[in-house]
Regions:
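Gram-negative and organellar
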Residues: 1-163
Length: 163
């Protein structure tokens, strides 16, 4: 369920609620459900520019408690249309993920998750109405569990169409 409401001509608020279920044939310990509640406040100071701040709550329930968790996330970002048809979007996020139970090593996992992303595209470049965008994403997870701390860099091509 997604709801978007314009507070006035410059401010918009969006809320999303999701419910899902996972069922696995072989890894039945991961069977369960998940919930997401997401809120975003966007500010459009002028044409071609926007800022946003958001907060999310995600809960994953599984049969085994060492795979079940709660995740609280804060995000902020900025989008800008530049000259020559270039557009960019920059976002930063911090999340705290806390697992419900201890694993085989008797460690109850607690993660601090950091993420940044930069997206670049040309507004006049599209194919059949689909605009390609290139994104660089960096993620760092700092965990109290030695097996789950990592850094990840990704570059990917995103294809999008606005209706």
């Amino acid at each position: 369920l997604d709801l978007t409401y314009w507070l006035n001509e410059k401010w918009q608020i969006s809320t999303a609620l999701e419910y899902g279920e996972q069922r696995y044939n072989t890894r039945k310990h991961l069977n369960g459900n998940n919930y997401l509640w997401s809120n975003t406040l966007s500010y459009f100071p002028k044409s071609g520019q926007f800022w946003f701040i958001g907060a999310d709550y995600n809960r994953e329930n599984t049969r085994d408690e060492d795979n079940a968790y709660q995740r609280k996330n804060l995000r902020l970002g900025w989008g800008q249309e530049w000259g020559w048809g270039i557009s960019t979007r920059i976002s930063l996020a911090y999340a705290r993920r806390t697992y419900k139970g201890a694993d085989l090593f008797n460690i109850r996992q607690k993660n601090n998750e950091y993420q940044s992303a930069v997206t670049l595209w040309h507004r006049d470049l599209y194919f059949w109405g689909i605009t390609p965008k290139i994104t660089w994403s960096y993620q760092r997870v700092s965990s109290n569990h030695p097996f789950y701390s990592y850094d990840k860099n990704r570059i990917f091509l995103e294809m999008g169409k606005t209706f």
